[in-house]
Amino acid sequence: MVADTHQRGTAKTARNPIKIDLEQSGQLLRKPSWIRVRSPNSQRYQEVKRLLRENKLHTVCEEASCPNIGECFGRGTATFMILGDLCTRRCPFCDVAHGRPHAPDPDEPMHLAKSIAVLKLNYVVITSVDRDDLRDGGAQHFADCIRAIRAQSPQTRIEILVPDFRGRLEIALEKLSACPPDVMNHNLETVPRLYKQCRPGADYVHSLQLLKDFKAASPHIPTKSGLMLGLGETDEEIIGVMQDLRAHQVNMLTIGQYLQPSIGHHPVMRYVSPEDFKTFERIATNLGFSHAACGPMVRSSYHADQQAHEAGIE
């Protein structure tokens, strides 16, 4: 595969160990009334898009076809995606393209910090594609971005949503601990039974260890994780994952509804009602999470500033 080849949908997942059942995927469940998304058409939305293009920046909002993009861009917030727009993994729920990435752009931290300063953002989320091709998984680039943002916008709070750094965990955590964020986020995404199907190349135990080891190295930094419902999990399995997260000292939690980006992606197996999401939120509170955001349209970085504020991060 040549660099910059963008594979999506069935082209991306063709080599996965567990194939998508296209016949089942074609039998789409009807979206319930509580799944509603605003069209992205505000002036602020266009302003944010223009600034991103001028500075050659990517957002996970666009690359992953997030349903909340109109609202978030309209509020002048975005989750910036560093290290390019090509992922080395092939997760069938995700709309980010797979391919052989280019080398990291050494000017990206500067461009990112400049854009954040121009937008006068008080809270930013920085995420990335998986970069299994890099010796540190991209951790140094995360640290460089954090450092550049703090230099230009010292008042801005920074949350990072990191990949799993599988096979590179020790060196990655060393680099991140030297320049830590205000919130450390790594999403488990789903239950361990579905990992081979939904997160090929990832490992449930390893992801928990990442969160635990970061907390051990930086105990004052809140840790956070997120889950999607509708991939084939049971309620009991979700509660088990919540218990595992608390056992690994994770402070904050998000749970949202999985929405299928295209017919070539993993099908939606169920739609969870707002009432059931509220039940998960109550369980999370009882388990001791400092903050839990659970709802159909909740995403890991959706209203992340409000989540952090409610968890006591100023």
UniProtKB/Swiss-Prot annotation:
Pfam families attached to this UniProt entry: LIAS_N, Radical_SAM
A GO cellular-component term linked to this record: cytoplasm
Keywords assigned by UniProt, alphabetized: 4Fe-4S, Cytoplasm, Iron, Iron-sulfur, Metal-binding, S-adenosyl-L-methionine, Transferase
UniProt pathway annotation: Protein modification; protein lipoylation via endogenous pathway; protein N(6)-(lipoyl)lysine from octanoyl-[acyl-carrier-protein]: step 2/2
Bound cofactor: record note: Binds 2 [4Fe-4S] clusters per subunit. One cluster is coordinated with 3 cysteines and an exchangeable S-adenosyl-L-methionine.
Cofactor: [4Fe-4S] cluster
GO molecular function list: 4 iron, 4 sulfur cluster binding; lipoate synthase activity; metal ion binding
Catalysis performed (reactions): [[Fe-S] cluster scaffold protein carrying a second [4Fe-4S](2+) cluster] + N(6)-octanoyl-L-lysyl-[protein] + 2 oxidized [2Fe-2S]-[ferredoxin] + 2 S-adenosyl-L-methionine + 4 H(+) = [[Fe-S] cluster scaffold protein] + N(6)-[(R)-dihydrolipoyl]-L-lysyl-[protein] + 4 Fe(3+) + 2 hydrogen sulfide + 2 5'-deoxyadenosine + 2 L-methionine + 2 reduced [2Fe-2S]-[ferredoxin]
Chief location of this protein within or outside the cell: cytoplasm
Family: Belongs to the radical SAM superfamily. Lipoyl synthase family.
Name of the protein described by the UniProt record: Lipoyl synthase
Originating organism: Nitrosomonas eutropha (strain DSM 101675 / C91 / Nm57)
Gene behind the chain: lipA
